Amino acid sequence: MIKTDARMRLDRRRFLVGAAAIAGSALWPWPATAQSNRMRLILLGTGGGPRPRKASSAPAQVILLNDTAYVVDCGDGVARQLVFAGVALSSLRHIFLTHHHSDHNADYGNVVLLAWAAGLRTRVDAWGPPPLKRMTKQFFDLNAYDIATRIADEGRVPLVPLVHAHELNKGGPVMQDENLKVTAALVHHPPVVPAFGYRFDARDRSIVISGDTAPSDDLIKLAQGADVLVHDALYVPGIDRLVAGIPNATSLKQSIMSHHTTAEDAGRVAQAAGVKTLVLSHLVPAEDPAVTEQMWIDAARVHFRGPVIVGKDLLEI
């Protein structure tokens, strides 16, 4: 049974999916120092769009391996969700932004600032499309008074030198450390260009995060043989009810339909990529009582023959 009380959400449901090594893991040689702890994935926020909701936070997820946190997207409230998930904010080492929509980057700066307030003393590398470097500088400029005051008054290490922003303009290898390696692919999310999906390969398993995208051949190539594909998903019959409640966005339906993926097509992508498990996330509509979990699953299973999981906040996979 899923516990909905916030204090009880630490008892996350766990879905253990395949741990085989995958095609694509030979992109780079494995570091000799890589350890053997299992790579974990926790969905921090699974609702699509920037409007705050009661039960589903904005898009974010964290990959954990050997006490290191790799955060993918930073929607509103990501720091609090990390705390709910039992992740030490001081373990943050890498941030990957798929694209620059506010439901994916609104708390990019905040998660670093709050991690620093919670004891972060080590380097954090951020990866994503331009203008990530300018955004990073502007966030620190905005919060310069608070940062300087805390350094002087509380004896904290300087924050700005800890954060290193790296801008991506094309797909390919992103980074590799002693735990895993990361590869990006361009995905189709107009008018936001570039937008990326990311693949994380460790010794025991592989995880792909689609970001926001219409069905993408490049994403299918990126996800070949992956253990887990987390893909954004629409349930088309619920879109009209969603947009009816947002009267100041007159072309919202057209926007949603043109550069996201239906649950059925997410299944098609997963099948074409040969992934082991499909996770539907960035759900649109989120929290519509007329759209049941089984409806999402049935739509994805039109084309995908493997396990389908409907994402929920704080679900560990």
Predicted regions and their residues:
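N-terminal signal peptide c-region/cleavage motif recognized by signal peptidases
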Residues: P29-P31
